[in-house]
Amino acid sequence: MAACAPVLAPHGVDDAVPTLTQATFQTRDGETLPLRIWGPTHPKAVIVALHGMSDYSNAFTPVGEWLTDHGIATLAYDQRGFGQSEHPGLWAGGDVLRHDLSDAVAAARRKYPGAPVFALGESMGGAVVLSALARSDAPNVDGVILVAPAVWSRSDMPLSYRTALWLASHTFPGMHVSGNGLKIWPSDNIPMLRALSRDPLFQHSTRADAVYGLVNLMDEARHAPDALPATTPPILFLYGKNDQVIPREPTEAVVKGLGDRAEVHRYEHGYHMLLRDLEAKLVWQDLADWINRRVADVVAHGRRPHPSSSSG
C-alpha cells in the first residue's frame, strides 16, 4: 500500500535566499517559479497574490492591470504544481506553499523598501494565506485579502465524500478527476470561462492525491481563526452570495471566527471567481479603497492598521 500513498512533489534543500526578478521567484530550496508583476516602479502598496486550485498567476492579469492605474503593484507567481512550474499536477504540501508565501513577501519587501505589503489569496490561495496566519512563522504583511477562500473542511463534508476521497487518494493517487458534469458555475463571466477551457496552462483535471492535499489545506484554513495571534494583521474578506464552489456554511463559520479582525463584503451577484466576474470592478474598487485606508493608517501612525468593522 505504500506505493499507493499520496505523492508529494520533490523538495530541495533550504539553503537559497529567496529572490524576485521581473519574471521569476526563486524559493528557499532553489526552485524557480514563474512570476508576473503589474504596477508602477514606486508603488504606494504591494500585493503578493496567490491563485486558486488548477489556476496560475495569469488569474490576476485583469485586476493587476487595473490596480496599476491606482498606484498598487501586484506580484503573482505560479504556485508549485500549477501553471508553468516544475512538476505540474503534483501537490507540494501545505507547509511548502506557506513557506513560499512568507518568502515571497520577504522578497517583495526587499524589492519595494518602505511600501506596505499585503497578501491576497483566492480560493486555494486563500486557504494558504489564512492557514499561514496561524503559524509562528506567519508572513510579515500589513494586511490580508481573502477572496472566496477554500475553507470546506472534512468536518463540513458528508461521510460519503470523505470516504471516497481517502480511497481514491490512497488506492489510485494518480487518477485524474474533473468537475465535468457537476453543473457548478464558478463565475457568471462566460467568455472568461470559455477562455480558461482553452488555456493549456489551466489544469482541467486533478490528481486524486492533489485533491486530498487540498482538503488537508482546507482543514487547516477552516480552523485557523481559532489559532490566530493578537498580532494578526487586518483582513478584508470577500465572498459572493452565488458561490457554488465553497459552501456558505463553512464560509460564514470562518467569518464568525475572524470576528472584528475582518472587514467583510458579501456580493449579491458575486460568484466564486469574484475578481473575474462580470461585476469584478466593484470588487476591485472595494479592494483598492481598503488598501488605501490601510496605507493611510500605516503612514499616519507608523504601525499596522486596526481592522474596520464588518459590512455587507
Residue spans of the language-model regions?
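Conserved alpha/beta-hydrolase
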Residues: 64-88
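Short beta-strand/loop motif that positions the catalytic acidic residue
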Residues: 231, 237-239, 243
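Short alpha-helix in the alpha/beta-hydrolase fold that links the catalytic acid
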Residues: 233, 247-256
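Catalytic active-site module of serine/aspartate enzymes centered on a nucleophile-bearing elbow/loop
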Residues: 261-311
